[in-house]
Amino acid sequence: DKIVTFLGRITMQKGPEYSVEAANMVLHRTRNVRFCMAGSGDMMDQMIYLAAERGIADRFHFPGFMRGKQVYECLKDSDVYVMPSVSEPFGISPLEAMQCGTPSIISKQSGCAEILTNCIKVDYWDIHALADAIYSICHNDSLFHYLQDEGKKEVDQITWEKVGAWIRELYMRTLGW
């Protein structure tokens, strides 16, 4: 089975319900996918209930809050990472996933969508696009390996020096210098 992971605070800001609804759509097309929703937050019970209500609780795992080594082990064991955030100033977790070689699907509304190119970007509310992206990565080996390899290369090249230079350049252009 393929493993699709949502890792973060299980709160309205992170859009966990979109992940569960997309999972439901994926599982109507194939049963060889399992979903992991790692984290804690005020919507945890609601997500467990939603998975049960949709009849997909047997394909979901809710391990709770993770830190440090647990996070990296979870990401390395995953085939796809999803971050359907409604509001996300930046979002470091997709970079961590990509660094582990895990293809990522992120919200176009997240800050990291501005700098990442080797991932799939969807509108957070578009569960059809999210489901299609999950299904595609899980069932298209070429796409999986491309996102795995190129995503890792991309995040391995991100350094504070490069980010600082990019921000400086942005300010210079904005100020017309």
Task: Tell me what each language-model feature is.
Residues 142-172, 176:
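A charged, aromatic-enriched C-terminal amphipathic alpha-helix characteristic of glycosyltransferases
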Residues 91-94, 112:
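Short glycine/serine-rich donor-binding loops of glycosyltransferases
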Residues 65-66, 73-78, 167:
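Short alpha-helical donor nucleotide-sugar binding micro-motif in glycosyltransferases
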Residues 48-66:
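Nucleotide-activated donor-binding/catalytic signature segment of Leloir-type glycosyltransferases, i.e.
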Residues 1-14, 20-23, 36, 148:
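Conserved donor-binding/catalytic core segment of Leloir-type glycosyltransferases
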Residues 119-128, 136-141:
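Conserved acidic donor-binding segment of nucleotide-sugar-dependent glycosyltransferases
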Residues 86:
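Aromatic "clamp/platform" in nucleotide-sugar-dependent glycosyltransferases that forms part
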Residues 103-106:
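Short hydrophobic beta-strand element within catalytic cores of glycosyltransferases
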